């Protein structure tokens, strides 16, 4: 009974930025649970790389080129996938960028706009476009990738624009959850700690920075992509059928202090 709640057979799942790192792990987790996964990425080479990685493990993912900052393209891709599959049951908004170590007074206009456009606007465009199809079917689960940076101010690096974008994702998640709960669509988020991905590779080259990160984390380590994908799988599945508007911290205890 309980394991069956994680079975996603017959469902269509779209993962933005699903070809690498956390996104690829989410694509694999959802595929393993039985979903038909679409990897949506602005870079088709990355999407193809992810598709090939899944194929080597026995999963047949589809790919779609999609720039999350282009609302018209997002709407078109959502319509194409919904038409091809007869609906969309799961959306994972994972696409994002990170910029840090810039004092707020020195942040360039284009850097602020770029981070907000990808990390926050992109999540809204995707939730709106794919959510429309879920609302029509009165069924769906959306999982947004937020960050512990949406709860706390990271140290010692300065990253006001990234923090603001992720705080926005958290509150957008709650707002959409409240609006759509009675219409069959659940919206939740996962808030990861520092995860071993190319986005955090710079920290290991800076021992002083890395040591501060680890000293600030009760578990004393960075996370792995599969640890985030496991939380995403749970929230996307019927095992989380009573959960909506939740932002689940997967941070090794970082936000405890």
Regions found by a protein language model. Give the residues of each.
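Short C-terminal tail/terminal secondary-structure segment
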Residues: 1-5, 98-101, 232-233, 244-257
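The beta1-alpha1 cofactor-binding region of Rossmann-like NAD(H)/NADP(H)-dependent oxidoreductases
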Residues: 44-45, 64-76, 109, 226-227
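A conserved structural motif in NAD(P)-dependent oxidoreductases
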Residues: 217-228, 239
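Alpha-helical segment proximal to the catalytic Tyr-Lys
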Residues: 132, 178-182, 241
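Residue(s) in the substrate-gating loop at a strand-loop-helix junction
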Residues: 147
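Active-site helix of classical SDR
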Residues: 127, 165, 173
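Substrate-binding pocket helix/loop in short-chain dehydrogenase/reductase
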Residues: 102-104, 108-116, 213
